[in-house]
Amino acid sequence: MSFTPANRAYPYTRLRRNRRDDFSRRLVRENVLTVDDLILPVFVLDGVNQRESIPSMPGVERLSIDQLLIEAEEWVALGIPALALFPVTPVEKKSLDAAEAYNPEGIAQRATRALRERFPELGIITDVALDPFTTHGQDGILDDDGYVLNDVSIDVLVRQALSHAEAGAQVVAPSDMMDGRIGAIREALESAGHTNVRIMAYSAKYASAYYGPFRDAVGSASNLGKGNKATYQMDPANSDEALHEVAADLAEGADMVMVKPGMPYLDIVRRVKDEFRAPTFVYQVSGEYAMHMGAIQNGWLAESVILESLTAFKRAGADGILTYFAKQAAEQLRRGR
């Protein structure tokens, strides 16, 4: 007879036995979070000696490149394996055609070069998207009716990804959700000799209300206004569609896939991992961070909620986590908490 949980009966089975001591709890732990699972997203400013707090993201700052290099010393010492860069584009450099996105002297490109030179062992992941660079805050080029044009936008995204690879980024991460952009970027990278540049595809990126603080951070909230991204980001009600998106991106040459946001979409993380067994990442987005940090600062939740929330992503099947809590999590893990 096969053994199933239904065959286990009290008192011979006491599930609390293995919870009795710390050593046995550690021995039977099914999922373990380590610093190797963490990616820290950072917001990069133009200028020198610049630091700006983000009111909707307590504890997170926008940093100029010189300040970013100073902070990165500590992040590297903590063992954080990679940073995800998000540039804050000056208003005067935004345009309808998002040309600043592929400027070789743009903020992301300069930050990538500086970080690679100072910390050659540190992974640099760059955001491939147009919303920080457009005057309207959308992730692509618009037609006369305000609709985001898919194929025209891809042409700009390809130029942006190539500029990041040429600056030294080891991973480019298209977050735009245009159809076919992964294949176009992969083909361009191969043709340009960037065969080892990885693509982390934002494959299942939902049209979520949890992105608000991020848009404040990169300065696109005012540009987007009351607009939305429902014509290209996924409907939060859909689950099967996420599998189609992931399948398409893997077929087009993605090396890693992502689910975004994280906590409200743990079911999607599990489905993606079970279906494809591909490297699967999840983004604990700005709204999730703001909720947790607000509760921590007000004494409503203990700081231990940070590691608990990140462990939930591991339990759901994630191989890595983009989180603004990466530094705090690394410190807590080092202390054994």
From Swiss-Prot:
Its cofactor is Mg(2+). Signal peptide: none annotated. 5-aminolevulinate 1 binds at residues 215, 229. Keywords: Heme biosynthesis, Lyase, Magnesium, Metal-binding, Porphyrin biosynthesis. GO terms for biological process: heme biosynthetic process; porphyrin-containing compound biosynthetic process; protoporphyrinogen IX biosynthetic process. Homooctamer; formed by oligomerization of dimers. Catalyzes an early step in the biosynthesis of tetrapyrroles. Binds two molecules of 5-aminolevulinate per subunit, each at a distinct site, and catalyzes their condensation to form porphobilinogen. This is Delta-aminolevulinic acid dehydratase. It comes from Pseudomonas aeruginosa (strain ATCC 15692 / DSM 22644 / CIP 104116 / JCM 14847 / LMG 12228 / 1C / PRS 101 / PAO1).
